[in-house]
Amino acid sequence: KALLAYLNIPNEAANGIDLQPDFALLVPRGYAQRIEQGNIQDPLLRQVLSLQSENERTPGFVVDPLQEGNVELGYGQTPGLLHKYQGRVLMITTPACAINCRYCFRRHFPYTDHKPKDQHLALGAIAQDTSIREVILSGGDPLLMNDDGIAALIRDIDELAHVRRIRIH
């Protein structure tokens, strides 16, 4: 409601909006300032505005489209690390993002199972598996980590001779 009021969106235009979404609304002021006042159809607003239609079940669609919670595929063996493809791992660095996009494919990700304080476990697993050539830093948004934290993490990964690439997702 606060965002709609800030944008001068009339109540009658707000039909179909989910005012208590499972995936919280998170919009920085700088982003909100770029949304066209009074326009419920503004594309920037539609990216972040939760609609009741999000709660409708659609055949063929699943809560975890990347199957990142599927233990049978090897997920969850090391906290903070997803190892879906040969030679590549994805490290969860932070659960946070600066904005909650409605198309987020990790909105149901079990971040409580992948805590940043467990990064040493993930680094240990990467160090032991010399088949890993690429580490993808993801989350949330890894760039929300403080400068010292992300620099130290990149240094730690860079010290592993078998890792050839570090990507930030």
Annotated model-derived regions:
Residues 1-83:
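Flexible, acidic/Gly-rich N-terminal and inter-domain linker regions that tether
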Residues 35, 48, 52, 95-97, ...:
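Generic hydrophobic/packing signal
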Residues 61-66, 70-92, 99-169:
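Conserved Radical SAM active-site core
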